[in-house]
Amino acid sequence: SQLNKIGDTLAGAADQSEDDNNLFEDVSDSDTDGDTEGKVFNCMNLGEVNADINAGGITGAMARENDLDPEDDTKTSGSSSLNVTYKTRIVVRDCINKGTVNVKKKGGGGIVGSMDMGSVLQSYNFGNLESDDADYVGGIAGQSKSIIRRSAAKCRLSGDNYVGGIAGSGFTITGSRSFVLADGDEYVGAIAGGLESSNSITNLNSALQDSESEQSGNYFVSETLGGIDGVSYAGQAEPLSFQEFCDLTAQEGMPDEFRNVTLNFVANQVTVEAVTVEYGAAFDMANAPELPVKGGYTAEWSDFDHDHVVFDQTIEAVYTPLDSVVQSGDTRNGLPILLAEGAFGTAEVT
């Protein structure tokens, strides 16, 4: 019957899908220093990235192409066999992003927007992710169905659903560090907003237990966030005090940015001074740098919460044009009775 034919067709498609999965072996996680193919290594991005989907500071997506050309895309060695397995390698290693990443719809990451396969190893992100309406936003990867190891993020994150310090949604995440401010609607976490499958937390736990490194596990510092979707897990997505986090990242040789809270005072897109402050302390505006003078304008630093500083901030100089003429409040026949000419700031007019 036609129903039987349809059933056979669907069963055949499922078998073909299973065969395709067995045909490819991802060897990215066994990367060594001597491996050079299928690898992005020691790269830095400082530029702004803008995309609708899959926006990343280093790469947009890590996935296998649908079309495979056996002649050009594969290497053969040894005797011929009907049982063929293709080994694939997609590795991003020792890369740094400092550029802002903007994604409109889905998949924004400091290093990679979307990971279907491959590994991100020992990579850092310091670029903010500005994606108020997008799903899957992460400090390292927006959406990862694969492996992230020994990576770290310090940035501001904004998104809709699935917003995470390391991955918006992740699978295997080990040995990673997060110091972020994250804002989202649902599924928000300092390590991951969510996990890619119901057994991901088991997979994560097994990976941590099997690790021989003393720095196994994922750690973060935050006064407001939980580790994974608002919940912290000892040894897997665990909070530390700021001092403990500083000691750990120093021991691991991570960049100084992970141990500093900095106020950047900027005027006309030029940094006037970068002031390092103590985590959680108040900043006295009397210690702010002198504002650069701009003829015909008054100047002040933009307002910010300086009573409890827990993250880097950029404070912009705000310039307001001086009034060249001021008038009295008293009028005669609807006109001011007195005009004064000069250069007046708002605070000088009473």
Where are these regions (language model features)?
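A generic structured-segment signal
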Residues: K106, V270-T276, A282-E290
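Conserved "repeat-terminator" motif of extracellular CCP/Sushi domains
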Residues: E252-V266, P292, F304-D330
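Non-catalytic surface loops within mature trypsin-like serine protease
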Residues: S222, Y279, P321-D323
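Surface-exposed interfaces of beta-sheet-rich extracellular modules
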Residues: G38, I90, E212, A281-T314
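Residues that cap or initiate secondary-structure elements
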Residues: V49, V101, L129, T271, ...
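Surface-exposed loop/turn motifs in large extracellular/passenger domains
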Residues: S1-V188, A192-N260, V293-G296
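Short, solvent-exposed loop/edge segments of extracellular or virion-exposed proteins
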Residues: S131, A182, N264-G280, G329-F344
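Extracellular, surface-exposed repeat/solenoid domains
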Residues: E348-T350
